[in-house]
Amino acid sequence: MKKLIIIAGLILLIACAGFLYFKKDVLKTTDFKPANSKAKSILDLRPSIIAKLQQVVKDASEGLYILSIDKLEPDVLASKLDVIDGTISVDTTAMQQLDQLKKLPDDVFIIKFHSLHIDGIGIGDLLHKKTIDITGASLNDPVIHIYHKARSYNKEEHKKNDSLTLYQRLMGQMKKIAITAINITHGTLIIHDVAQPKRLTKFNDITIRMNDILIDSSTQYDAGRFLFAKHALLETRNYTFPTPDSLYYVRLGRISLTAEKHEVTVLNAQLQHRGSRQEFEKRLHGRDEMYDVSLPKVVLHNVNWWQLVNREKIVSTKTDFYGGTVSVFSDLSIPLGAKKPMNHFPHQLVMMIPVPVLVSELNFHQLKVIFQQYNPETRSIGMVTCTNISGTARHITNIRDEIRRLPYTSLTAKALFMNKVPMAVRFKFNLANYQSGQFSANVNMDTLNKITINPIAEPLGRFTVKNGQMQQGTAHIEGDNFNLHGTVEIFYTDLHITPLKSDSTHGELKKNHLKSFFANTVFIKNENPSGNDLRQPAVTVGRDHHQNFVAYIWTAILTGLCKTMGIPVKLVVKNE
């Protein structure tokens, strides 16, 4: 999209320049002959204007690009200029020469457009060659193909301001160009990765609005402007692509770039599984989670959007998620597949991203997370929800120098467990030792009662809480790829649980009174602390290859709960 603006701006500016220089001494060209449009009379200067524009494009691009115009319609009385069916193509010989001279840009493009319209070219413009003032310009239906290849000799050039080069090339014959507004509508952008020809990125229905464009000596170094525009907004809608495993689609409803702020806003971002739940599960090679993510609004601040589009780098000083839902579903009736790799913790996944990543701050605002699990033994689905999640992750990166500077990613968040109970979590991920997966976690939860617990306990744990209340609970855990250890501390009173059994006839759960009597009489410790004795058991668990990160932590916490309550761990925690 960046090159779309540059070329659109070039077209607009050189079209204006050509129109204003159509006096005899200005319309002379060095090596171009009028093409496509034939002069109807000695007074019809359109072929000469086209030739002049072609010369300017050639000179401005050092011979790389060739401009073709099918039709040019100047209207001096109405102060208008229309360019119909234009094309900018590549001179392959010049491209090879520029590459040999180490002057070829990383992005080479081909543009076709249906119409370019310019308003507000008045008498003042005609009288002052060195100054151009235009009311507005519009470019309709452009199709832009960009062929991207990162060239090592351009690394230093990338540090320079693109606008400076553009200024130097355009301002050789004039002192000032001012355009009130530029509008580009219904554009199509297709990005080709030269190194990976099969990787194609396509954006449809692109809209670009640029206001208060001023090119003169006062703006050539103005970092607050984007391509000399005081304000520039780029938008595209309905961008969709599949994930590499073909299990999901990523859908982005609208992408907006406020260019001078280096700010990208994405509305209605979604990760959707393909097909129905049954169709999705048929594609799996074994038991796995199914994810669905919906984010109404995502804002990336201080981001290099062109590097992001070209998949070269993901850098943002701050990113905000506003609202949204993350749903995770698993089906225990699906057979286990092959053992999963033991390197899929959050910080390990970031390290696997094939491009440099640095998100200094990631904020969540009112996020909702839903975990659902189907248990074939109870023939029911248990659901755990965490709502009103607000928190911050800091220093998300895979860049070695950044890791040496600060070797940790941290995450702190607050939420409502089951829509009611306040809870807080804090994670610390060791980036310097990411291979072993080192991390620590602290979990704190407020009051729990049977109304909150039973919707989870009955379908997933096959027990129901008859009486009891937890006043508070905390867990501190440290671990890696293979083991977790830590402590779990819960304060509760008057605990009484009832095991459940399946009714083979109706598939319903019924109370198992014999087990209930035995459990509450022999095993269950119905309060903690008991007197002055606070049970705070140490916990050590080994990781199952099929466990994800959340299930791994939950196993450790559940083990601590069982030890505190006096329930044999093997009755609750199952190793698969």
Feature map (PLM): residue ranges:
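Glycine-rich, small/hydroxylated-residue low-complexity segments
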Residues: 132-134, 311-333, 347-363, 367-370, ...
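C-terminal/domain-terminus segments
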Residues: 11, 200-212, 318, 378-393, ...
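Sec-dependent signal peptide cleavage junction
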Residues: 22-56, 153-168, 173, 340, ...
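Interface amphipathic segments
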Residues: 201, 217-257, 262, 266-282, ...
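Extended intrinsically disordered, low-complexity coil regions enriched in Ser, Thr, Gly, Ala
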Residues: 150-155, 196-203, 332, 337, ...
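Extended terminal
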Residues: 4-12, 17-25, 29, 34, ...
